[in-house]
Amino acid sequence: MPLRDQSVTDWQSALDALLALPEIDGPVGYSGGVIAVGTRLAVVEPRIRAAVLFAGSFVPRATLGEAPRVTIPLHVLLQWDDEGNDRQAALALFDAFGSQEKTLHANMGGHTGVPQFAGAAANDFFIRHLA
């Protein structure tokens, strides 16, 4: 999956640049909307200690296959009536993640109906795992 792999390489380059700054230290989290990128990054990048993933994009078989290798804490957001994505595929991916700590936050509404409190819940997750 060339786009996913290039995105992961770009994220790793961004991490290299940010973590080289003297004012940046401590554990790193990831939050992103393309679940294939976030899953792959969680598998290959040991500097990522926790992730917030949006289950609102296509779930390729390769992503489902590598999900058991994701062992960091996860906070997964799912819009229950997302008109562009398969809910069952998102639930299967969540089930396949190998993380001992994973939470699924399902909200009513479509792809663009993410409630504002979802951001606060994601921030609280990062505070618990990165502070």
List the predicted regions and their residue ranges:
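Catalytic histidine neighborhood in serine/cysteine hydrolases
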Residues: 90-91, 95-114
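Short beta-strand/loop motif that positions the catalytic acidic residue
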Residues: 70-71, 76-78
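Alpha/beta-hydrolase active-site loop
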Residues: 1-22
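A conserved short beta-strand
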Residues: 45-58
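Conserved alpha/beta-hydrolase "acid-adjacent" motif
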Residues: 62, 83-89
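Acidic catalytic loop of the alpha/beta-hydrolase fold
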Residues: 80-85, 112-113
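Alpha/beta-hydrolase fold nucleophile elbow
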Residues: 22-33
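Catalytic active-site module of serine/aspartate enzymes centered on a nucleophile-bearing elbow/loop
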Residues: 108-109, 114-131
